[in-house]
Amino acid sequence: MFIVIEGGEGSGKSSLAKALGDQLVAQDRKVLLTREPGGCLIGERLRDLILEPPHLELSRCCELFLFLGSRAQHIQEVIIPALRDGYIVICERFHDSTIVYQGIAEGLGADFVADLCSKVVGPTPFLPNFVLLLDIPADIGLQRKHRQKVFDKFEKKPLSYHNRIREGFLSLASADPSRYLVLDARESLASLIDKVMLHTQLGLCT
């Protein structure tokens, strides 16, 4: 089972991933928590280069292919082996983040980026079983991030950028509602977990 958690900045992806993982471990399930970009040694090094480039200005296309390179390695090295071993894999961000951030917000084109995302996984289609979209007004999400007082380059973008991010995620969910569970990220973590467990109960039954 492959579950992806998506959402804009400050939506609580890491908190939901950990809480969901804890819930499933308590049910004696094997769980792997991971993230993108990152999730493996090469991926984490690319993450550092993308999010905090050392006095470098990455072009939009260079940045896109760094994300895709991280994903290609992550899928082959971590995600597929874990799924084969019977793990439930919970990943913070996947294809949709790339389509929304690089395709929509950065202006490279959603269809162009989606096509590249489909190719980077190889000849066999590889999509999550469930996409959990944490939706939150961009200004509230940024307020949450500002409390942390440490920002990557995307979190430093203007509010208009983050509004495009939110609209992009919602447009993807609206276009393919069977793939998504859209959650109000302002709700309590306990409420979110209840909704996720209800939504996924058939897929997660032993």
Curated annotation (Swiss-Prot):
Q: Name one GO biological process term.
A: dTTP biosynthetic process
- The enzyme class is transferase
Q: Respond yes or no to whether keyword Acetylation is given for this record.
A: no
Q: Which UniProt keywords apply?
A: ATP-binding, Kinase, Nucleotide biosynthesis, Nucleotide-binding, Transferase
UniProt KW Transmembrane helix keyword:
no
* SUPFAM superfamilies assigned: P-loop containing nucleoside triphosphate hydrolases (SSF52540)
Matches recorded under CDD domains: TMPK (cd01672)
Cellular component aspect of the GO annotation:
cytosol
Which reaction is this enzyme known to catalyze?
dTMP + ATP = dTDP + ADP
Cited PROSITE patterns? THYMIDYLATE_KINASE (PS01331)
Which is an annotated GO molecular function term of this record?
ATP binding
So where does ATP get bound?
G7, G8, E9, G10, S11, G12, K13, S14
Q: What does this protein do?
A: Phosphorylation of dTMP to form dTDP in both de novo and salvage pathways of dTTP synthesis.
Annotated PANTHER family: THYMIDYLATE KINASE (PTHR10344), UMP-CMP KINASE 2, MITOCHONDRIAL (PTHR10344:SF4)
Q: What is this protein called?
A: Thymidylate kinase
Q: What is the lineage of its organism?
A: Bacteria, Pseudomonadati, Chlamydiota, Chlamydiia, Chlamydiales
